[in-house]
Amino acid sequence: MLGQLGFIATAVLGGGMALGGAITLGTVQAFLQYVNQIAEPVTEASYVITSLQAAIAGAERVFALLDEEEERPDAAGDASVITQGHVEFRHVRFGYTPERTLIHDLNLEVHPNEMVAIVGPTGGGKTPLVNLLMRFYELDGGSISIDGQDITALPRGELRRRIGMVLQDAWLFEGTIAENIAYGRRDATREEIVAAARAACCDHFSRTLPQGYDTPLSGETTGVSQGHMQLLTIARAMLTDPAILVLDEATSSVDTRTEVEIQKAMARLMEGKTSFVIAHRLSTIRSADLILVVRDGDIVERGTHRELMARNGFYASLYRSQFEAA
């Protein structure tokens, strides 16, 4: 930009002087060439400086990653002990950084087959609870056990295979419908895959595709709606039949009809399993055995929907505000 302005200024001033007879056109041409020759290295230098600044910023991120504490060595315990889904949090403390503790002295016991709903404002500490359960993060203090076994004594991979997840952003990979459903159980038969899809209300949808269950899905899952993607992930969880489920905002971005299908599929999925449901839409978790109201990393209220509404506290205000907004 600076070089272009210099070129224009030289051309205008030189042209005026040439018309007045002060200099010749050859002199003007020579000055224009000089301006180009001077501007080019200045422009290149600015590009180099910009590239260096980007490289320095990238290097800072790389070295910050290298300076991170290494993941603790994997344990050699037996995760097959996880059969009931009895979960206990004892004096759990956690923070993303040492300077800021997010969860303070959390104590919680979840019995087998119970549905636990976790609600609260955005950024209040709902998702970290299940992330800690699956050991995506390590505790700063306290312990978490499943069926009496401390999760730090179990291999991470084996632990996570025994916890089914249905997330808000349904994740499918490149492969067929059947391969996506069987992701957690590669040895599953076609009959088992179809049975899981039927229970998850996505059998009809799968059969109407051009190649049925053998229809390939691309990375962008063209032609598959968000609701159907979530139904496929529910079918995947049904096929693995885990003792514990984590359901994170699974109906927050679908239409009403699809939401009804997802709710039916989830009801079947949660039968006989310990379930942790993270939701902002409080109407979907009124039947939960236990509702945890989390704010700033602490459980400020706990109880059933009826108990919490009777207390007329933070949960009741959240619940009423949603229906007033609707």
Where are the predicted features?
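ABC-type nucleotide-binding domain
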Residues: 74, 80-326
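Conserved catalytic core of two-component sensor histidine kinases
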Residues: 32, 39, 160
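Cytosolic ends of transmembrane helices, especially the final helix of ABC transmembrane type-1 domains
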Residues: 7, 37-65
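An intracellular "coupling" helix at the cytosolic face of ABC transporter transmembrane type-1 domains
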Residues: 1-5, 51-54, 71, 93-98
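Conserved E/DxxT/N motif and adjacent residues on the DHp alpha2 helix
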Residues: 64, 71, 182
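Transmembrane alpha-helix boundary and packing residues in multipass membrane permease domains
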Residues: 12-16, 60, 249
